[in-house]
C-alpha cells in the first residue's frame, strides 16, 4: 500500500470561462486502496463566497490549511494573492506546517492559485488548474473542452471534466460538488 496514493487520491479542478469561475471536487476519501467515504466535502468558501478553496491530500492537513488560509485572508483584507504567498511562506518554514501533506487550489475573481507544501504559489496558464490523483485527467479534459468555441458554461465543462477523471482515476468518484466564485 503506497502512502503517496493515500495522500493524493482525489480530484480538484478549477477553471475560468467568460468571467465565471468554478471549482469542483469529487467526494471520495481513500486510504491506500480502500474507500473510506464517498461523499466527503473537499471545498470551502471563505470571505462570503468571494474566495473558494479545495484540497487534495490528508483530510486533517487540508482542514488545518483551510483554517490557516482563513486567518491570512482576514489579516490581509481579502487579498488572495498576498494571503497565499504568506501562507506558503509559513507552510515552508514552520516546523509543524511543513509536515502537512496536502495541496490546495484557491480562487477569487482575479486569481486561480495552486499552493503546495514546498512553498510554491503557482498561477496556472489557460485559466485551468487541477490537483490530486485525477488532476491530470480533469485538467486535460477541461483544456480540450475550452480549446474550441462551444456553448458549454464553466460549470458544464467542470462537471464533464470531473466525470472523465472519475472514469479513469480509481481514487476519484462521481459524487462531484461545485462552488462558484461570486
Swiss-Prot record:
Subcellular location: Cytoplasm
Active site: 10
Keywords linked to the UniProt accession: Allosteric enzyme, Cytoplasm, Hydrolase, Metal-binding, Protease, Sodium, Threonine protease
Keyword Membrane recorded: no
Entry annotated with the keyword Glycoprotein: no
EC number assigned by the record: 3.4.25.2
Activity control: Allosterically activated by HslU binding.
GO cellular component term, pick one: HslUV protease complex
Binding site for Na(+): 166, 169, 172
EC class name: hydrolase
GO MF annotation, one: threonine-type endopeptidase activity
Catalytic activity: ATP-dependent cleavage of peptide bonds with broad specificity
One of the protein's GO biological processes: proteolysis involved in protein catabolic process
Function: Protease subunit of a proteasome-like degradation complex believed to be a general protein degrading machinery.
NCBIfam families found in the cross-reference section: ATP_dep_HslV, PRK05456.1
PANTHER family according to UniProt: ATP-DEPENDENT PROTEASE SUBUNIT HSLV, METALLOPROTEASE TLDD
Subunit structure: A double ring-shaped homohexamer of HslV is capped on each side by a ring-shaped HslU homohexamer. The assembly of the HslU/HslV complex is dependent on binding of ATP.
Family to which this protein belongs: Belongs to the peptidase T1B family. HslV subfamily.
Name of the protein in its database record: ATP-dependent protease subunit HslV
Taxonomic classification: Bacteria, Pseudomonadati, Pseudomonadota, Alphaproteobacteria, Rickettsiales
Amino acid at each position: 500500500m503506497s502512502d503517496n496514493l493515500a495522500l493524493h487520491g482525489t480530484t480538484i479542478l478549477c477553471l475560468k470561462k467568460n468571467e465565471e469561475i468554478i471549482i469542483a471536487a469529487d467526494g471520495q476519501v481513500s486510504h491506500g486502496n480502500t474507500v473510506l467515504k464517498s461523499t466527503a466535502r473537499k471545498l470551502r468558501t471563505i470571505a462570503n463566497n468571494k474566495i473558494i478553496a479545495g484540497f487534495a491530500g490528508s483530510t486533517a492537513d487540508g482542514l488545518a490549511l483551510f483554517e490557516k488560509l482563513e486567518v491570512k485572508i482576514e489579516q490581509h483584507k481579502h487579498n488572495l494573492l498576498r494571503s497565499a504567498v504568506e501562507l506558503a511562506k509559513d507552510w515552508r518554514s514552520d516546523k509543524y506546517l511543513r509536515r502537512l501533506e496536502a495541496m490546495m487550489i484557491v480562487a477569487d475573481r482575479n486569481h486561480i492559485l495552486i499552493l503546495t507544501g514546498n512553498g510554491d504559489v503557482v498561477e496556472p496558464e489557460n485559466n485551468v488548474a487541477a490537483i490530486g490523483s485525477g488532476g491530470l485527467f480533469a485538467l486535460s479534459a477541461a483544456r480540450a473542452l475550452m480549446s474550441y468555441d462551444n456553448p458549454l458554461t464553466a460549470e458544464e465543462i467542470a462537471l464533464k471534466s470531473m466525470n472523465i477523471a472519475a472514469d479513469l482515476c480509481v481514487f476519484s468518484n462521481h459524487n462531484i460538488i461545485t462552488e462558484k466564485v461570486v
